[in-house]
Amino acid sequence: MFKKVENKANFPKIEEKILKFWNDNKIFEKSMKQREGCEEFTFYDGPPFATGLPHFGHFVPNTIKDIIPRYQTMRGKYVKRNFGWDTHGLPVEYEVEKKLGISGKYEIENYGIENFNKECKKIVLRYTEEWKNIILRLGRWVDFEKGYKTMDINFMESVWWVFKSLYNKGLIYESYYVLPYSPKLATPLSNFEVNLGEYKEVNDPSLTIKFKIKDKNEYLLAWTTTPWTLPSNLGIAVGQEIEYSKIFDKKKEEILILGSKKLDSYYDDENSYTIIEKFKGSKLEGIEYEPIFNYFLEQKDKGAFKVHMADYVTTDDGTGIVHIAPFGEEDYRILKKHTNVDIIDPLDAECKFTNRVKDFQGLFVKDADKKIIENLKLRNFLFKRENYLHRYPFCYRTNYPIIYRPISSWFVNVEKIKTKLLEVNEKINWMPAHLKKGRFGKWLENAKDWAISRNRFWGNPIPIWICSKTGKKICVGSKKELESLSGQKIEDLHKDKVDKITWPSKDGGTFIRTSEVLDCWFESGAMPYASNHYPFTNESNFKNIFPADFIAEGLDQTRGWFYTLTILGVSLFESTAFKNVIVNGLVLSSDGRKMSKSFKNYTDPMEVINTFGADALRLYLIMSPVVKADDLKYSDNGVRDVLKNIIIPIWNAYSFFTTYAIIDKFQPPKNLNLVKNNNLDKWIISELESLKKILNNEIDKYNLTKSIESLLEFIDKLNNWYIRRSRRRFWKSENDKDKNDAYETLYYAIKTLMILLAPFIPFITEEIYQNLKTDEDKQSIHLNDYPKANENLINKTIEEKINLARKITSMARSLRSLHNIKIRMPISMIYIVTKNQNEQNMLIEMQEIILDEINAKEMKIKSNEEDLITYKAKANFKELGKKLGKDMKTVSIEISKLKNEDIIKIINGISYEIKVGNTKYYLSLNDIILEREEKDNLKVINEESITIGIDSLITKELYLEGLTREFVRQIQNLRKEKNFDVSDRINLYIENNETLQEILNKFEKYIKTETLALNIIFNKSKLEKKINLDDNIFTIIGIEKC
């Protein structure tokens, strides 16, 4: 016997109860146990940082990462779900710096690297319990106990193996290169880390500087927006084909050279200068000039202080002449190509000038701009100063400006494997698909060598030891190898430990480790190997778990984790590291801004779960554009709407079934016979079997959007058609076969639907299943196999018939709404127009249902719209504009004059001739836009090939019937308000008025049947609620149980 179900459910409390049921009965563990030995489905979980609490942005991928493994487990696969933690890197160090009140490399070194790393280890997992509680409360099944941490020695050792494998393949090299650099963190960043940060609009000083040509009183006017780079100037760049002008500035009495196109930008009055000559930039090549600062004069003999050709120079901004210092990627390339200058970098780790630039020593580069400008102005090198508004990158961790500077770093040679990267990308199933060729594919096409070293402390040390005497390098790939080389026992691989490990070289030097640590993205990219301690353990099973069948993360990971996984997969095995990926977009606040505690622009996620339930939140996220890698403007109201429009209707269907099943003592038979006689039963069973096919197909393709859409469509069909149209079958007093078939069908539909929904909304489905399951059923809904379609029960003919009836009903309801005709008000006639003979035949079969649904007395089927409307036409300018040209206006006037019968001919495929002068034009249906004018009292609507019309004239008889239906609805509402049981018989009390008397005279029996009223009594003392039957018709009613 089923338990009684409350109409109003507290879903968060139900979810807490289900969590306890899962924990007490170890359901997750059982779901894993029963699939042991089955085909393995590999899922990689991208490791988050545990330095902050999870937010809505984490909830999206965590929901996706729950749905797919649940589904695959129900499909009979063995799916390991081990949680991972990203424990190294800048995010952790930055948190510790804030905690300790220290900042920068020097202060950390003074504090002590060992002490600093101890603090990192303490803080790194401070939120793990909160993460565990929140993720489990979201309904995600994942094993936290067997999870991995990137700081574990086994994980770190496998990362060393990955590094050495790349090193041995010639894919690792050390070099100076201009890299994005975080001054606050005192370390270079990779290009994709820069993209993780924010580009802000900034106002930088824009300077035009005079560079004096050697042995001449002539000056090159060079432009820059980075004054701080001027002390390191080593060259000047011009465009080879750009035209330059040598002018005499009458006011300054100086000879100046700048791009000809830029003269108007610098001089308002062309009489203020005289053009001496014009020439191409190639004429300036090799010209020497006098340096504006004397800090690096020794570089002159190595080719510094000359003019070079550069294809990146334009006249869009500035003067068409650009100063060169080794702080820009293009500048650095030009200097390397044309000179032998040394690497000039007069900055310390925090981007403050060193004593190489004594006048500005100790100043942060951006702060030095002002003093440098003053210096240049004082010495008459400053020609012009302006402000330049442009977008500039800021560090994604410190929100501090990024500085580009030449720095020694270790790189992965991505250029060398770029062709293979693009090749393996073709084998990945991206969801959404456009990312393959779009965002990810384009990123691979433009991929640069990856800077993987960080001048930091809490990370996996780069395992290279260098001989102090010869520079010989040894790359270490394991703990055992390091022990063998050093003769020391290794217990920990962190920097503060391994930096102490040295050993003598045969050449009389000492092997000392290079000081850098690995970019933490290298570690996360190595996760498939390191989380399994490959190749030191699990080597034989590795081929079964690589590449992953599935991963999921946010859009930003196209330049992060997805990218590093692919680089290392290709480098190691010439393979992608994953076969299928679902990419989600950003979750923003309702105002479109980034969610921020400081902005107070979002609700605490746990408050949302405790208010609406995790199921509602999961469904809201999965239904949204965020699952298609688009942004979502999060709204609490959106979650509330999902609860109201989806979760509660599911509950109502379940409540409806159990309520009547308890009354009639219905018990499902052991073997349900699903071959039914009633068309409604046949239809909903067929729709359910078709749904199974769709879901198995779409989830297998990782198309969650299509899957959810199909589930929601079925829920609507079940609630708003099957149950609503079957109500009277459950209300019958006698338990005949039809009533029993209705019970069996609805039981099967709800129970099966719950199993189909279980991966998406695991709580409510478990709650409902627990009440519906029989003794033969599995202990938990999540221990079931995912349902597969029974093709024998799919009846496409009946699906088409009823779905056509539903379409007509929907159109008629829209038409009523458009013209303010209430659904309870009967109409005398509906006309349905379709030329399709098959549709006409189906409409005849569905006539009784359609008339009942739309509350109409009669239905007529037509083949031609003109029985309901007259046509007018307008010119379709989009089509005609291409072929009419100057005659367009004349023809459009003629089209507007077309008669109804002419337009009908055009609709029927007969072209219509219009003559303009001696030219004839022939109109087809594509050339005109139809306008419909309704006949008489008809109201008409058209959708694709179907047109319907309703007679809007309401007679008095129809009007009274409509009032009766509204009267019944109000009585039913009062029954609900007073918590009467659906089977309770009542006495109905009413006031005596003329309108009610008319209603009773005609519809008393109908009212009693619908409301279970045994008696209708005029009794003023029992009246309790005023009701509105129509705009100006009110009455008072009361009810009591008999």
Curated annotation (Swiss-Prot):
UniProt motif ('HIGH' region) ranges: 48-58
GO molecular function, one term: zinc ion binding
Keyword Ligase: yes
Domain of life: Bacteria
Matches recorded under Pfam families: Anticodon_1 (PF08264), DUF5915 (PF19302), tRNA-synt_1 (PF00133)
UniProtKB keywords: Aminoacyl-tRNA synthetase, ATP-binding, Cytoplasm, Ligase, Metal-binding, Nucleotide-binding, Protein biosynthesis, Zinc
Chain sites annotated for binding ATP: 597
HAMAP family xref list: Ile_tRNA_synth_type2
Family note: Belongs to the class-I aminoacyl-tRNA synthetase family. IleS type 2 subfamily.
Function noted in UniProt: Catalyzes the attachment of isoleucine to tRNA(Ile). As IleRS can inadvertently accommodate and process structurally similar amino acids such as valine, to avoid such errors it has two additional distinct tRNA(Ile)-dependent editing activities. One activity is designated as 'pretransfer' editing and involves the hydrolysis of activated Val-AMP. The other activity is designated 'posttransfer' editing and involves deacylation of mischarged Val-tRNA(Ile).
Protein name in the entry: Isoleucine--tRNA ligase
